[in-house]
C-alpha cells in the first residue's frame, strides 16, 4: 500500500517555511491505518518485543494498537508532571532550548525487550531521550519504528546503534 498517498503536505505550518506532514488522513482511512499498524506489529513481533513504548502524543496512536495486537503492555512516555507516580526523567537539547521526557519507574522491567514506536523521525532527539529512559530502567531496546522519516534531518545517525524501521521516507 502507498502510505504516502495518505499523508497531507501542509505548507507554512506550524510556522512559515515549514512543510508539515499531516498524518490525520492516514488515521481517518481504516485500511491505511490498519496497514501501518500491521507493519509495526510484524516488526515488533520479529524483535520478540515484551513491551511497546511510545512518546506522547502520536507515539500513543501507533504504539497502542501494536501492544494490543501482540498481547503485551504499552508504556507511555510523557512530558514532566504528567505521570502521577514515581518516574524517571531525561532532558535533551532542542535547536532552540531543551525539553524533558518522563517514564514511570515501574514501566520497564530489567531485561524486557522493548520496541519504541513514534510517528516521525526528524532530528532523533526525542527518540534518543526515550531510548535513554528505557535503558535507565534496564530495558533492552530491540527496535525503533516510525511512520515517517525526514531523511534530510539525519535523525537516523543519532540512532545508529539501533534497528530502525520507517514506513515512509521524505
Curated annotation (Swiss-Prot):
Recorded catalytic activity of this chain's protein: AMP + diphosphate = 5-phospho-alpha-D-ribose 1-diphosphate + adenine
Source taxon at top rank: Bacteria
Cytoplasm listed as a keyword: yes
Please cite one Gene Ontology biological process associated with this protein: AMP salvage
Q: Where does the record say this protein resides?
A: Cytoplasm
User: Which keywords describe this protein according to UniProt?
Assistant: Cytoplasm, Glycosyltransferase, Purine salvage, Transferase
Pathway given in the UniProt record = Purine metabolism; AMP biosynthesis via salvage pathway; AMP from adenine: step 1/1
Report the EC number(s), separated by commas if there are several.
Answer: 2.4.2.7
GO CC annotations on file: cytoplasm
Q: Has UniProt tagged this entry with the keyword Coiled coil?
A: no
* GO MF: adenine binding; adenine phosphoribosyltransferase activity; AMP binding
UniProt xrefs under InterPro entries: Ade_phspho_trans, PRibTrfase_dom, PRTase-like, UPRTase/APRTase
Quaternary structure?
A: Homodimer.
Its biological purpose: Catalyzes a salvage reaction resulting in the formation of AMP, that is energically less costly than de novo synthesis.
- Report the sequence similarity comment from the record: Belongs to the purine/pyrimidine phosphoribosyltransferase family.
Check the record and name the PANTHER family matching this protein.
ADENINE PHOSPHORIBOSYLTRANSFERASE
What is the protein's given name?
Adenine phosphoribosyltransferase
Q: Which organism is it from?
A: Acholeplasma laidlawii (strain PG-8A)
Amino acid at each position: 500500500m502507498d502510505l504516502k498517498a495518505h499523508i497531507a503536505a501542509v505548507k507554512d505550518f506550524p510556522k512559515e517555511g515549514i512543510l508539515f506532514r499531516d498524518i490525520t488522513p492516514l488515521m481517518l482511512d481504516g485500511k491505511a491505518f490498519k496497514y501501518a499498524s500491521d507493519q509495526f506489529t510484524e516488526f515488533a513481533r520479529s524483535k520478540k518485543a515484551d513491551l511497546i513504548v511510545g512518546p506522547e502524543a502520536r507515539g500513543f496512536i501507533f504504539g497502542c494498537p501494536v501492544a494490543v495486537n501482540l498481547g503485551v503492555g504499552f508504556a507511555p512516555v510523557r512530558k514532566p508532571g504528567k505521570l502521577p507516580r514515581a518516574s524517571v526523567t531525561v532532558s535533551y537539547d532542542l535547536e532552540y532550548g531543551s525539553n524533558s521526557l518522563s517514564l514511570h519507574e515501574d514501566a520497564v522491567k530489567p531485561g524486557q525487550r522493548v520496541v519504541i514506536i513514534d510517528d516521525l523521525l526528524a532530528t532523533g532527539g526525542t527518540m534518543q531521550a526515550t531510548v535513554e529512559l528505557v535503558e535507565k530502567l534496564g530495558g533492552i531496546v530491540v527496535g525503533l519504528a516510525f511512520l515517517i522519516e525526514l531523511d534530510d534531518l539525519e535523525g537516523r545517525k543519532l540512532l545508529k546503534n539501533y534497528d530502525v524501521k520507517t514506513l515512509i521516507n521524505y
